[in-house]
Amino acid sequence: MNETVEALDPNEPRLITESGVAARIAAIVTPVLADLNLRLVRVKVTARDGGTCQIMAERPDGSMTIDDCEAASRAISPVLDVEDPITGAYRLEISSPGIDRPLVRLTDFDRWAGHEVKVEMAVPVDGRKRFRGILIGTRAELAVVKRTDAPKGEEPEVSLPVADIGEAKLVLTDALITEALRRAKAAERGLGEDEEFEDDADEVFEGDEADEKAAKDAANAERANAKKAADKAEKRAGKVARKAAKSEKAEKSQAKTGKARLSKAEVDDLAVTNPASRALRGGKPKAKETH
């Protein structure tokens, strides 16, 4: 099998972009990343962990190392401090696009053809906003997807204007993990757009199987951790609800007891002023003495 690493155009514009504060940050950091021979993939600002600004970037060959992330963080942080686009404290997070990466440029839809994708349109197509299926590639400025969620009798192939896409993201599968690792290995070897290496069916990169297993294990662990966190949150919510119910029950019981004590006190007061009322407490009034 022949493998090449396609060089990316560092100046290719993103067709899927941000809005609001994230758009302003994107405009600020794009030239900073370009000076580092990196290009912006996406900016996302969330309230997570007290405020997070996540910036995804990549090299012209599609890779992104830890050293790249550190260099980008050192370069971007002081610029954001000066421009101050975010109100309040926040945490800056620089990362690679990841295996299940967002697709933001026209060439992204060609480079990852053959893999499963989820698309959410900013502008509906045939009354639909969400699509899922196998990415076929592009025609002109349209992303072509063979839908796996198409109802029976409906045409599965759909052409989506890339400029009207709100978000497009690869779906994490075993095939995608294998391909992403293969490309990462090729990038490590410094293979350019026109360079190839032979990868026979019986020959694999040293450590590829272990790396692939580690990636799959990491993906499974991430899913397990998400489920564990959800279960923990559900248990915590149930515990809080039970505690609240118990507290409410105790308050009602206390109020009822207080009322009973008050009634008894009233009977006692009545008994002092009228001995005959002792019958109210289960006693009998004394007979009058005769002389």
UniProtKB/Swiss-Prot annotation:
<dbReference type="GO" id="GO:0005829">
    <property type="term" value="C:cytosol"/>
</dbReference>
<dbReference type="Pfam" id="PF02576">
    <property type="entry name" value="RimP_N"/>
</dbReference>
<feature type="compositionally biased region" description="Acidic residues">
    <location>
        <begin position="193"/>
        <end position="211"/>
    </location>
</feature>
<feature type="region of interest" description="Disordered">
    <location>
        <begin position="188"/>
        <end position="291"/>
    </location>
</feature>
<dbReference type="GO" id="GO:0006412">
    <property type="term" value="P:translation"/>
</dbReference>
<dbReference type="InterPro" id="IPR028998">
    <property type="entry name" value="RimP_C"/>
</dbReference>
<keyword id="KW-0690">Ribosome biogenesis</keyword>
<feature type="compositionally biased region" description="Basic and acidic residues">
    <location>
        <begin position="212"/>
        <end position="237"/>
    </location>
</feature>
<dbReference type="GO" id="GO:0000028">
    <property type="term" value="P:ribosomal small subunit assembly"/>
</dbReference>
<keyword id="KW-0963">Cytoplasm</keyword>
<dbReference type="InterPro" id="IPR003728">
    <property type="entry name" value="Ribosome_maturation_RimP"/>
</dbReference>
<protein>
    <recommendedName>
        <fullName>Ribosome maturation factor RimP</fullName>
    </recommendedName>
</protein>
<dbReference type="InterPro" id="IPR035956">
    <property type="entry name" value="RimP_N_sf"/>
</dbReference>
<dbReference type="InterPro" id="IPR028989">
    <property type="entry name" value="RimP_N"/>
</dbReference>
<dbReference type="InterPro" id="IPR036847">
    <property type="entry name" value="RimP_C_sf"/>
</dbReference>
<feature type="compositionally biased region" description="Basic and acidic residues">
    <location>
        <begin position="245"/>
        <end position="254"/>
    </location>
</feature>
<comment type="function">
    <text>Required for maturation of 30S ribosomal subunits.</text>
</comment>
<dbReference type="Pfam" id="PF17384">
    <property type="entry name" value="DUF150_C"/>
</dbReference>
<comment type="similarity">
    <text>Belongs to the RimP family.</text>
</comment>
